[in-house]
């Protein structure tokens, strides 16, 4: 955001800004690209003076806890390639997700819960597809893939015993299956057989750990009030934020929350407000909650999407309505917690918020920085596959963004 952007409303985006850059097929045929001024009020908050929208008042209130990165960028311009890219470090399918990489590299301190858990909530906007490969293990051993917790019914499918099967009989069945699997492993030395044995055992232990984890009756009323009106509604973002904190307390090292609905090609003024209502209070509450419990210094909270949106209107621009197309050239994310510099604003874009003019942060740079916070050198964190030492940050190279790190982490 820049105050001068309000003067640009309705004027054509100069061709020099686009400079022949690729845009989506949804707007490539437009004859006019009128700029749209910010639809909401922005004010500066915190010691950093970062600008926050009026529809994110709770995130604005933690401005001094976060680093605001205004120069994130990606080459992808459509949803699935972009989500795949930011999760796996490449637009090509078949690569491990960040959670799988970290599960592989760091392991999990919990014997009773997976090392990587995914939860999905749905906003009130249109929902793009989310494929299970986004939390998959790719070419890493399959034991490192994420486990999706469902928003209704059984959190994990087939975890509960079917009618007529007791815990004792389930134990006996597993022992018999494991004996067969161990014999097969002795014959073939296939590591995936060991993975299967371990996953069966984990599922058995989760029959006790998951019900305890997902029972929010033990949470006091003030916690629900802190997270907002949806905090008691399964499947909502606020509910998932509380579950995420409980997972972290129980030793789950990597929790990923997807909130769908951020695709306002039309009806921006209405739908963006609704989406922000879903996430603003819970996201800020999670940071505060972790801090109050002494957990924030050991936890990294990352909030953002796969790309930004254009300054120009998609379709006609009217007094009350407009849309915005995908824009990967620059967008904003924020981070908080262990190793992250507090109250900092990083990066700058041009007057049209179309291109980055200072301190660009590619998504692979962002992932390299997260690994640094976890004590991992992203260049040495590799897995040999197809003749290459594969990395989460890609084989082309990435850099740690030291400017958003606390001083103690710059030289690990």
Residue ranges and their predicted role:
Residues 1-409:
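Ligand-binding pockets and gating/stacking loops
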């Amino acid at each position: 955001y820049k105050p001068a952007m309000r003067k640009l409303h309705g004027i054509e985006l100069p061709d020099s800004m686009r400079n022949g850059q690729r845009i989506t097929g949804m707007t490539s045929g437009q004859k006019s690209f009128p700029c749209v001024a910010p639809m909401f009020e922005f004010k500066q908050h915190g010691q950093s003076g970062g600008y926050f929208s009026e529809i994110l008042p709770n995130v604005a209130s933690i401005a001094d806890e976060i680093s605001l990165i205004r120069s994130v960028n990606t080459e992808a311009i459509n949803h699935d390639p972009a989500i795949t890219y930011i999760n796996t470090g490449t637009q090509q399918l078949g690569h491990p997700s960040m959670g799988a990489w970290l599960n592989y590299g760091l392991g999990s301190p919990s014997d009773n819960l997976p090392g990587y858990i995914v939860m999905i909530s749905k906003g009130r906007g249109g929902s793009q597809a989310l494929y299970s490969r986004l939390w998959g293990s790719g070419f890493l051993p399959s034991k490192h893939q994420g486990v999706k917790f469902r928003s209704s019914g059984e959190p994990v499918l087939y975890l509960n015993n079917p009618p007529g099967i007791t815990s004792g009989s389930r134990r006996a069945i597993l022992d018999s299956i494991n004996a067969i699997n161990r014999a097969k492993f002795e014959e073939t030395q296939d590591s995936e057989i060991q993975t299967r044995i371990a996953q069966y055992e984990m599922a058995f232990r989760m029959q006790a750990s998951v019900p305890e984890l997902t029972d929010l009756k033990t949470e006091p009323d003030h916690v629900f009030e802190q997270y907002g009106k949806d905090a008691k509604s399964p499947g909502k973002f606020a509910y998932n934020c509380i579950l995420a904190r409980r997972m972290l307390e129980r030793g789950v090292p990597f929790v990923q929350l997807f909130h769908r609905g951020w695709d306002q090609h039309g009806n921006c003024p209405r739908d963006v407000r609704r989406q922000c209502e879903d996430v603003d209070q819970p996201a800020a509450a999670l940071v505060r909650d972790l801090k109050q419990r002494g957990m924030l210094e050991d936890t990294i909270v990352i909030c953002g999407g796969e790309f930004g949106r254009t300054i120009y209107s998609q379709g006609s621009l009217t007094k009350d309505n407009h849309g915005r197309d995908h824009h990967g050239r620059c967008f904003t994310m924020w981070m908080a917690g262990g190793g992250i510099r507090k109250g900092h604003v990083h990066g700058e874009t041009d007057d049209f918020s179309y291109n980055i003019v200072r301190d660009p942060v590619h998504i692979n740079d962002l992932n390299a920085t997260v690994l640094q916070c976890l004590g991992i050198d992203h260049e040495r964190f590799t897995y040999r596959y197809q003749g290459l030492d594969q990395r989460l940050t890609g084989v082309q190279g990435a850099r740690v963004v030291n400017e958003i790190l606390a001083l103690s982490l710059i030289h690990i």
